[in-house]
Amino acid sequence: MASQDGTTELLSQSVNSTCIPGSTYHVDRGRASSASTPPTSPPLSEVDYTPLLESTQEPRHEYTQLAHSLVKAMADYVGHLQEENLPMPSLEPAAQVHGGLKVQGGVAARDTVVKLAQKIVAMTMDPEMKLFISSLQFHFCSSLKVAIDLRVHELDECFRASSRQADALALARYREPHEADTLGFGLAFNTTANFWEVLARDTEGKRSQRFNRAMRAVNINALEVIPRIYPFNRIGGNGLLVDVGGGLGQVARAIMATNQGSRLQRCIVQDVCAADDVLEEVLESNRKLGVELQRHDFFDKQPVTGASIYFFRHIFHDWPDRACVKILKQIVQAMGRDSRLLICDQVVDDEPSIPATLYDIDMWTLFGGKERNRSEWEALFRAADERLYIKKVWTTTEAPTTILEVCLW
């Protein structure tokens, strides 16, 4: 009896993959045959497994016995699914979860399959390692450290915003986000202002402190890796790097310090708060490395024209496509013939990993932003200016950080 996906036939072949004493079935390379009858496979529920399980000349090892018991249990479970007209188990997203089995025997058969499979896994990888993994000790320890380092217990904005994102999605009628949309963040905190505006209005500074601590944790490894991803020491033009939205110059200082004495001679760090209450020690560090701060909103006209590099790190994933196009248009107008646009952001796979997907949801919930794959980046550049194209995507084995090198035709 063949099932929708051939599972029944496959199990039948597994059971009859050898000569079974007392049965009429002989299998040669998966083909059942008999001297007097045409090849056929019996329904799983009608297969007699007793000869198979007892047909050994010496005691069967427990490990092998488990395998045969698992096949028998799976066949029993399949039989119950067929009796209740339920589909075969599958990993497909739309697959039905078999929590609605009506016959108790089917539930018991399913539980037996799970228990046998778990025991086989434990014996295959050794019981000690299985206990370590199943108890999640490594997960708890590593997660606790991350939670403490990031002070997750203080991330009020993220958790409350996530709880309302489904409502925000319904309000937007399930389309791509726009700048003016009400997000989960807005619903959670009853505000029409975006995250950055709320952060700027934080008179007590608690939100700003939480955000800055989180960013410091994110930057721990990135500051060392970024200067090595792209050959900043070989840039052409006037040797000027403009770090747009670069805060107080953390990344810029790392890039300049790594490329002392190269063609990279000067750096301007632009941010809306670049001149607010900057510590003297920060200003001194910047001056020594040729870094200067400039107040600038990247939605406004770019005041520095013809720079060798316009650098954006973790900016575009904070904004929806329409806002990103506005930012890019300002840069295109300022770029010279030899200018390069460097975007340090994720380029996710077409089938993104779970962490990348969760990060994408975070950006969407808080900012209306998104993580993008290569085709989405290309579409974004075309929407800003048909002349923009990706020359190269720079990657490293040290970290998942990526730099897109974008030029004008």
Curated annotation (Swiss-Prot):
Superkingdom of source: Eukaryota
Pathway(s): Mycotoxin biosynthesis
Region Disordered, annotated ranges: 1-46
Active-site feature positions: H317 (proton acceptor)
Biased composition (Polar residues): 1-21
Principal EC category: transferase
Transmembrane intervals: none
Pfam families: Methyltransf_2 (PF00891)
Residue positions binding S-adenosyl-L-methionine: D271
Entry GO MF terms: O-methyltransferase activity
InterPro entries found in the cross-reference section: COMT-like, O_MeTrfase_dom, SAM-dependent_MTases_sf
Phenotype upon gene inactivation: Leads to the loss of pyrichalasin H production, but accumulates the tyrosine and phenylalanine analogs of pyrichalasin H, called magnachalasin H and cytochalasin H.
Keywords linked to the UniProt accession: Methyltransferase, S-adenosyl-L-methionine, Transferase
EC numbers on record: 2.1.1.-
BP GO annotations: methylation; secondary metabolite biosynthetic process
Function: O-methyltransferase; part of the gene cluster that mediates the biosynthesis of the mycotoxin pyrichalasin H, a tyrosine-derived cytochalasan that inhibits the growth of rice seedlings, but also inhibits lymphocyte capping and actin polymerization and alters cell morphology. Pyrichalasin H is indicated as the responsible agent for the genus-specific pathogenicity of M.grisea toward crabgrass. The first step in the pathway is catalyzed by the O-methyltransferase pyiA which methylates free tyrosine to generate the precursor O-methyltyrosine.
Family, per entry: Belongs to the class I-like SAM-binding methyltransferase superfamily. Cation-independent O-methyltransferase family.
Protein name, entry field: O-methyltransferase pyiA
Organism from which the protein derives: Pyricularia grisea (Crabgrass-specific blast fungus)
